[in-house]
Amino acid sequence: MKDKVFGEMQFNVGWCKMETISLWGNLYTFKIRISTTKDEVPSEKQQQAYLSFKKNLNEISEKSLGLVNDFLSNNIDEILGELGEPLPTNLTDLLIPNQVLLFKNGKTAIIFDAAWTDENVVIL
């Protein structure tokens, strides 16, 4: 499917495409995923949320880094219990961003792989 805002997308539990995005001064390959069924196309709210995400990426990068550091600080005992010491010098290596999820209502979430568990972490 080709969308006027997202471009070429494939269906895999929502319409998806891969995109390289700079976050926290690093380049990451993100899956951009639209919360839809196969019969639906991205909504105007999802298109606007994506455009806003791209436009405000520097602010999102700064804000999400603070949230990630807070999350890691609040969960340090669990992380140490799973990984032991020493922890990586760069604590953001413990949470690797891998997906931007755009909900039908226009909300956006960044999903991370967590180094100490098989579960994902979400920051809205």
Model region roles, listed by residue range:
Residues 117-123:
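Short, surface-exposed coil-to-beta transition loops
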Residues 103, 115-117:
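A short catalytic or substrate-binding loop motif that flags glycine-/basic-rich loops and adjacent residues
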Residues 109-115:
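Short beta-strand segments that buttress and anchor functional surface loops
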Residues 1-109:
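N-terminal domain-onset segments
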